[in-house]
Amino acid sequence: GWLNVDVLPRAEHDLMLDLTQPQAWPLQANSPTVGPLVLDEGQAEVIVANNVLQHVGDLPRLMTHALQLLKTGGRLVIEVPYEHAATAWQDPTHVREMNENSWLYYTDWFWCLGWYEHRFAVESAGYLDIELREAPRERAAFMKVTLLKVETTLRERMTARTMSAGIELPEDVPVPTRLYRPRQPAPALSVVS
């Protein structure tokens, strides 16, 4: 089933929860509509964020929580106003607008967010017109993007560790049991005559 999570008391939500704030998983909560529930890492198959991301203050934290809550292979389905649309900034509650490059930190530069084991991959991306029909970029009012939670590869984790401030080996790199230490050359003999 679906669980409608929102931060606004006036929204018709199942659970009032601010995913831009620190959260500890598993999270036990009591919903007025579904009763006691537990939210935990790797639990969700799909998260839908329809016209949400442009409103949140701490988008990296919200995206981190979405990544944590999704199963590997789970989808984050996003619909946001397109930055270049004439209507993008008409809502005074928007704190950002999105474009094609808005997803790079979550897909390609994931280590900037402290992610190492999982990241997002763009599964699909397209544009919608003001009536929410598929449209070419020139007539776009919205973007619709589906991000897929994927495991990072060993190469990606090595790159991520290299790009991070503290360099560490990923957990799946074998630790050498013997260290190679070259022999020190013997001291040169000096001949005294």
Q: What is the meaning of each model-derived region?
A:
Residues 1-84:
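Conserved SAM-binding loop
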